[in-house]
């Protein structure tokens, strides 16, 4: 997508993606806490999330915000004045059955497979489509986070393998 005014006024600092994966239902739900710095005062923020996933709620400072859905772009109406230079946070919630990869990794999405022992093997391939094929974010390469925390809840017997450094297992 293009660098819209709803993307350009804020600088992405950090994500905390917190999700639950239900392999039997091919379902993902969770939230993404987005930390950002205000570059220009604006009251509309674009978050990207591809159908068939649904952005269900947005919260800032304990206040639920209105979301205007326009295809894979979701525009969040901010209530709080966005002062230039201020550091802010927003939490978006989502759920659904993400696009299934047709021919991973070239035609991406989520691959819901099983190994020879019948154990679930789930993988994302989103290089071409963008990460918004399976989680809500600012899906444009001109602005990437300085850091990201991923919290992934999987059913007993499964292990999540992700990029980065393991912090803890609950």
Question: Language-model segments: which ranges?
Answer:
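Acidic/His-enriched low-complexity segments
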Residues: 1-170
């Amino acid at each position: 997508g293009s660098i819209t005014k709803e993307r350009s006024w804020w600088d992405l600092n950090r994500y905390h993606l917190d999700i639950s994966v239900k392999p039997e239902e091919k379902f993902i739900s969770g939230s993404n806490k987005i930390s950002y710095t205000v570059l220009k005062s604006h009251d509309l923020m674009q978050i990207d999330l591809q159908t068939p996933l649904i952005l269900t709620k947005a919260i800032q400072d304990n206040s639920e915000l209105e979301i205007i859905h326009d295809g894979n772009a979701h525009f969040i109406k901010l209530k709080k004045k966005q002062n230039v230079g201020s550091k802010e946070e927003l939490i978006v919630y989502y759920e659904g059955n993400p696009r299934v990869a047709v021919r991973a990794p070239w035609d991406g999405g989520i691959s819901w497979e099983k190994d020879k022992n019948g154990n679930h093997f789930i993988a994302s391939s989103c290089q071409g489509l963008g990460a918004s094929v399976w989680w809500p974010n600012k899906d444009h390469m001109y602005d990437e986070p300085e850091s990201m925390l991923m919290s992934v809840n999987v059913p007993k017997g499964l292990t999540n393998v992700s990029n980065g450094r393991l912090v803890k297992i609950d």
